[in-house]
Amino acid sequence: MKRFLGILVFVVMVLSVFAGPNHLVIFHMNDTHGHVWGTEDGGGFARAATLINQAREEVAKEGGAVLFLHAGDVNTGIPESDQLDAVPDFLALHYMGLDAMSLGNHEFDKPFEVLEKQYEVAQFPFLGANFVNEKRGGPVFEPYIIKDYGDFSVGIIGLVTEQTKVLEPIYLGENTIVDAEETLNMYLPIVQEKADVVIVLAHLGYHADGGRPNLSVEFTTSDELAENVSGVDIIIDGHSHTLLETPVVINNVIVAQAGDNAENIGRIDLWIDDGRIVDWRGEVIPLTSDIPEDPFIKMFTDAFYQLGSEALNEVVGVTKVYLDGERAHVRSDETNLSNLIADGMIWKTGADVALMNGGGIRASIEAGEITYRDILTVLPFGNTLYVLELTGKDIMDVLNYAATIPDGQGAKLHVAGLTAEIKGGKATNVKINGKPIDLNKTYKVVTNNYVAAGGDGYTMLAGKPGYDTYFRDADSLREYIAHLGTIEDYTSQERLIELDQVK
């Protein structure tokens, strides 16, 4: 018997030597923004679930494992999801077996109580090592997790962009976002003691190829993190909506990001031997229409879609006056509806000035109850609010261009926070919040992403410092109307007074 046991131990030892490296497959998504539902053209969580489940079956046969991660911004983008506080998104990720997600800045679009509800629904870790409570100090959610796979372990540290402090500050409350790199350096020794492989699940943004936003806050990007920090094996990133078709390697760190809107899913295959990555490969897989949708995920998310669609008919406010969005009117003069839209843009972002193009306003709202569907008819393009940092001189350039626009053009400018007189194709007597404009002062100006990119001839705005909030203009108007409750009267206020009409 003893001889038999000795032979058995010897065989096990020999097999372990020649067993080869362990196989770990990592699937990752980011910036899905409410796109839980696919279309006939592809995309959606149900198709992603099919690929993940297939890999689980295949890898299990060889004794490997699958890790599924999301790099943040589950929230905000599709009305049917937004109406339901992204509950269908988080439930779908739960049933898809998501192991963890990092917090994205759009997880703070709504009151903190909503995020807490989403956490309860999700039943998977929300990672954010640098999202801390200012009063008690320390992270609000889990800073990291350790996944033990028997022969090896993986540590996952979550980080959220410091940009959140200027992008979505309203609902941070007594919490804040602290320096991502400093936080990572604090947790790395702890995680390295417990794990063989270290992954940073980050919502920081990748800007190694340029396009780094110019903001009034210091922030870290994933490429900078890879360059500056040692001891990290992989950074799975989000926030910049970058499609890295194959991961890039920076300072021996694998950096991956999979685009946005659930159009793709990233896959990284690792082979791990003796606690080290000995080989890897990575790709981004487009979720094309030929990938079948997982029937369970599709079934229950379709039911939520119906609920969300019905929610579009829910009343968000009441107006006792006709809100004028007639094409001929908003392309020639300010109206009560254009003023309402611009006021809502300031209310949502805290900007000093709002700029809105008349061509973006596509319908009126009759007196009576206002539904979200009504609002989407007024603002149907899905444009997002874009905040720029403009000097007084920059604003004068905008106004002087607007002063040359003849009636009937979509570039007709509507404003909030600002008044001016237009005469002879020039803007004069310009005041911002009642005070004369200071040409050297920098102002916070909100417009939509179309105008910010130079649309409708506002080319002087293209390339100016600023950032996309990813707040849909329709959502901003909906929330502002809900805030007002009942619109008793919303008259035109002659914000841009045309002393001579440009025809």
Swiss-Prot record:
Secretion signal: which residues? 1-19
Query: So where does substrate get bound?
Result: 327, 362, 381, 450-456
Q: Which UniProt keywords apply?
A: Hydrolase, Signal
Q: Please give the UniProt note on temperature dependence for this protein.
A: Optimum temperature is 80 degrees Celsius.
Q: Can you state which reaction this protein catalyses?
A: (2R)-2-O-[alpha-D-mannopyranosyl-(1->2)-alpha-D-glucopyranosyl]-3-phospho-glycerate + H2O = (2R)-2-O-[alpha-D-mannopyranosyl-(1->2)-alpha-D-glucopyranosyl]-glycerate + phosphate
Example GO molecular function: 5'-nucleotidase activity
Q: Keyword Phosphoprotein: yes or no?
A: no
Question: Does the record carry Hydrolase as a key word?
Answer: yes
Note the InterPro entries from the entry: 5'-Nucleotdase_C (IPR008334), 5'-Nucleotdase_C_sf (IPR036907), 5_nucleotidase/apyrase (IPR006179), Calcineurin-like_PHP_ApaH (IPR004843), Metallo-depent_PP-like (IPR029052)
In short, the EC number is 3.1.3.-
List the GO biological process terms: nucleotide catabolic process
Which residues carry the site feature described as Transition state stabilizer?
106, 109
Q: Name a single GO cellular component.
A: outer membrane-bounded periplasmic space
What role does this protein play?
Involved in the biosynthesis of the compatible solute mannosylglucosylglycerate through a phosphorylating pathway. Catalyzes the dephosphorylation of mannosylglucosyl-3-phosphoglycerate (MGPG) to mannosylglucosylglycerate (MGG). Can also dephosphorylate UDP-glucose, ADP-glucose, GDP-mannose, glucosyl-3-phosphoglycerate (GPG), mannosyl-3-phosphoglycerate (MPG), ADP, GDP and UDP.
> Which PANTHER family does the record associate with it?
5'-NUCLEOTIDASE, 5'-NUCLEOTIDASE-RELATED
Q: What is this protein called?
A: Mannosylglucosyl-3-phosphoglycerate phosphatase
